[in-house]
A protein has these predicted regions:
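Conserved catalytic cores of soluble enzyme domains
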Residues: 154-156, 160-162, 182-184, 191-221
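Active-site entrance/lid segments in N-terminal catalytic domains of soluble metabolic enzymes
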Residues: 1-161, 165
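Conserved small/polar residues in nucleotide/adenosyl-binding loops
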Residues: 234-238
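Glycine-rich adenosine-cofactor-binding loop
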Residues: 168-172
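Short, catalytically relevant binding-site loops at active-site mouths
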Residues: 173-175, 195-197, 227-229
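Catalytic cores of alpha/beta
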Residues: 120-128, 173-187
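Glycine-rich phosphate-binding active-site loops on the catalytic face of alpha/beta enzymes
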Residues: 39-45, 137-145, 178-204
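A generic structured-segment signal
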Residues: 164-167, 177
Length: 238
């Protein structure tokens, strides 16, 4: 038991990342039923589709689950309203200023964690009053911060900059990686790609097979001129 498991009411300090196109109700409920924290990825869902996934997830598990919400999305007001209406108790926010919604969510009894790519942003999260911070290094899939700080450099930097409960993310997919993150000061981990390749994930079977066939040196960057987006992970073969 630590601050992360106590905060979210979970057995293990493992959070399944809320990935677009991958993290629907089947994956989130499976992770929650296994003792972790499953997250629905709202970023790829129409607001009413999100409502449907929340209801199906609640029917599939009686354990805590949450929703990951990128704050930059144009339908953010409608998404937040649905989250509140459906009684979601945990929200992970990213891609925006946590001050914009943290107070509103807290007023409705919702726990808030925010994803950051630097210790500077972690301090802003503490000022905004979030309940936990996710330190996401450049190894993470999806859209990352422009700092390009690697996960195991970022963890101690954020740990030294804030007193918030700390979740590490980015390139973590094995027990050894979880242990290393904890040694550096994390109290929990957020894992994405590893869960994206499970049967419960809604990712394309072709994508899953592709990732499972990768080896050392196969990590690739796509669309970097638009946004830092590393894909394809070598640690999955460990």
């Amino acid at each position: 038991m630590n601050r992360i498991t106590s905060l979210f009411g979970i057995q293990y300090p493992i959070i399944q990342g809320g990935m677009v196109w991958c993290s629907g109700w089947r994956l989130a409920s499976a992770v929650s039923n296994a003792g972790g924290l499953g997250l629905l990825g709202a970023g790829s869902m129409h607001p009413e589709t999100l409502r449907e996934h929340i209801r199906k997830c609640r029917a599939a598990t009686d354990r805590p689950f949450g929703v990951n919400i990128p704050l930059m999305y144009p339908q953010i007001e409608e998404i937040m309203a649905i989250v509140a209406e459906e009684g979601v108790k945990i929200v992970f926010t990213s891609a925006g200023n946590p001050k914009a919604w943290t107070g509103w969510l807290h007023e409705r009894g919702i726990i808030v964690a925010h994803v950051v790519s630097s210790s500077r942003f972690a301090m802003k999260c503490e000022e905004a009053g979030v309940d936990a911070v996710v330190a996401e290094g450049f190894e993470a899939g999806g859209h990352n911060g422009r700092e390009e700080t690697t996960t195991f450099c970022l963890i101690p930097a954020v740990r030294n900059a804030t007193t918030l409960p700390l979740i590490a993310a980015g390139g973590i997919g094995t027990g050894e990686g979880i242990f290393a993150a904890m040694v550096l000061g994390a109290e929990g981990v957020q894992i994405g790609t590893r869960f994206a390749l499970t049967d419960e994930s809604s990712a394309s079977p072709v994508f899953k097979e592709y990732c499972l066939g990768l080896g050392e040196g196969d990590t690739k960057l796509l669309l970097k001129k638009l946004a830092p987006t590393p894909v394809s992970y070598t640690h999955l073969r460990a």
